[in-house]
Regions:
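Structural signal for membrane-spanning alpha-helices in multi-pass inner-membrane proteins
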Residues: 39, 43, 66-73, 179-183, ...
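Interfacial transmembrane-helix boundary/kink motif in multi-pass membrane proteins
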Residues: 5-37, 77-106, 133, 261-265, ...
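Alpha-helical transmembrane spans of integral membrane proteins, capturing the lipid-embedded, hydrophobic core
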Residues: 28, 32-36, 40, 59-64, ...
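Membrane-helix interface linkers and caps
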Residues: 2-15, 51-99, 110-117, 276-302
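Juxtamembrane helix-loop-helix connectors linking adjacent transmembrane helices
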Residues: 7-8, 46-50, 78-148, 159, ...
């Protein structure tokens, strides 16, 4: 083939596609602020007047807020919304990791319940959900947030954060802050920070939205089941990662009576110490399913083994036990 043969031909096969752009942190923050603005206007009104239908509209808007900017900014959706075939080891590891994160969320809510009983009770009165059926809640409260909110947070926002922050712990902390502010109410910030950081950490380990979505769905499902089984599970029902949809209404006196300093110390010991093991085991199983080289449960190198065990197991357990016993002693000694 020479020049004369292609001189007047149409260069269809030679046209270069416009290169994909990376989503910047500034753009991600702008999108996030737009979502918050929509929550205080369209989404909140939809929830007030339409109940669970409003929640469905809210989640649909969240998904649109995640997807539309990717199209406008000409970002690669395959890099922003990473979904791959799941691995059985990593799937089990994600669920084990969730148990640890959920336990820490219970501790965070218990702390807020002890420190701010009045505000804690008011937030649950203001967000009490309308009556619904379990199949509807399964879709609206459990499934839709697991897809829509993960697309926004672990998809759009974390794809921007990881371009500037390469350390996974740093990414998780930043994403925890985003997830906390997403849920609007300050009294819920600590628990939502923990859950957001945990979801982002697992997503950073796997590069697969399936696992964080599975964790999100499982967390909402567990809290929803507790809501149907009984109204007394204060700390567990409090960790529903959803802007609205809370089923529990309690008085400040009931909250205060339920969470004394001694009770908090006991919860810290009961939930905190096992959480350390669940988080470590969950991460190991995730790495076993996703890493190219199968990891050891404990490093074989003596120096590294000592460092890992001390930093990941011994130190957290000692700190949790010390603080838990301190609150127990305060509660017993002073009756608070």
């Amino acid at each position: 083939m020479n020049y004369e043969q292609i001189r007047f031909s149409r260069p269809d096969g030679l046209v270069r596609k416009k290169p994909f752009q990376k989503v910047t942190i500034r753009q991600a923050v702008t999108v996030f602020l737009i979502q918050i603005l929509l929550f205080f206007t369209v989404e909140s009104l939809a929830q007030i007047y339409l109940g669970n239908g409003g929640l469905a509209i809210t989640e649909a808007i969240v998904l649109a807020v995640a997807v539309i900017p990717v199209w406008i900014l000409h970002a690669d959706p395959r890099e922003v919304f990473l979904v791959r075939r799941p691995n059985r080891w990593a799937t089990g590891g994600a669920l084990v990791f969730l148990i640890g994160a959920y336990s820490l969320s219970v501790i965070a809510n218990s702390l807020m319940m002890m420190l701010f009983p009045k505000e804690f009770a008011q937030i649950y009165e203001s967000t009490e959900a309308a009556s619904s059926t379990f199949p509807v809640d399964l879709v609206v409260v459990c499934l839709m947030p697991a897809v829509c909110e993960e697309a926004l947070h672990r998809g759009l926002i974390q794809s921007a954060v990881r371009e500037r922050v390469h350390h996974l712990v740093g990414q998780s902390i930043i994403m925890g802050v985003f997830f906390a502010f997403f849920h609007v109410y300050p009294i819920r910030y600590p628990a939502m920070f923990v859950m957001g950081a945990a979801l982002s950490y697992v997503y950073g380990l796997t590069g697969n939205l399936f696992y964080s979505s599975l964790m999100h769905f499982s967390c909402n499902l567990f809290a929803t089941l507790l809501g149907y089984l009984g109204q007394g599970a204060l700390t567990a029902a409090a960790v529903v990662p959803l802007p609205g949809g809370i089923r529990l209404t309690v008085s400040p006196e009931e909250v205060s009576a339920a969470m004394s300093a001694g009770s908090f110390g006991l919860i810290l010991l009961i939930y905190g110490i096992p959480a350390v093991f669940f988080l470590y085991l969950g991460e190991y199983l995730i790495r076993r399913g996703t890493d190219a080289v199968r990891p050891y449960f404990v490093p074989r190198d003596r120096r590294r083994q000592k460092s890992v065990l001390w930093n990941r197991i011994y130190s957290p357990i000692i700190a949790i036990a010390a603080v838990g016993v301190l609150f127990l002693v305060i509660g017993i000694a002073f009756g608070i």
